[in-house]
Amino acid sequence: MATHRKEPRWLSRLVVDSIHIEQLKEHGGLPGIRDENALEAALSRARNKWVYGQERDLPVLAAAYGFGLVTSHPYCDGNKRVGFLAIVTFLGINGRDFGATDSEVVTEILKLAGGQLSEGQLANWIRRHT
C-alpha cells in the first residue's frame, strides 16, 4: 500500500459544486443543495482523516469523499455522479489515475448508494483501480 507523505491537495467546495452543475447540464436533474450541513460534512471527511486520524493512503481519503457525498445526499440530485467524480478528481489532482470500467463504476456506486458497500470496501475497490 503506497502512502502519501505530504499533505494532499483537497477538493474545494467550488470544485465539487462545479462538478455538480456540469453533471446536471450533461445528464439532467434537479439543481440545488438539499442539505448544506451534509455537504460540508462530506467535504470535510477526507481532510479530517488526514489531520485527526493520521490517514496517509490516498484511496482511503478518496473513499471518504465518495462515501460522504453518495451516502449523505447533500444535493437535490446527482449525488452518485458527484461522489464518483470527486473520487476521480481527488486522485487526479494528487497524481493518481483511476481505471475502472464504466460498468464496474455503475455497479460499485449503486452498491454504495444502496448501503451494500462500506467505506473501507470502497477504498479497497479504488486501490485496485489506481
What kind of feature is each model-predicted range?
Residues 1-130:
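FIC/Doc superfamily catalytic core
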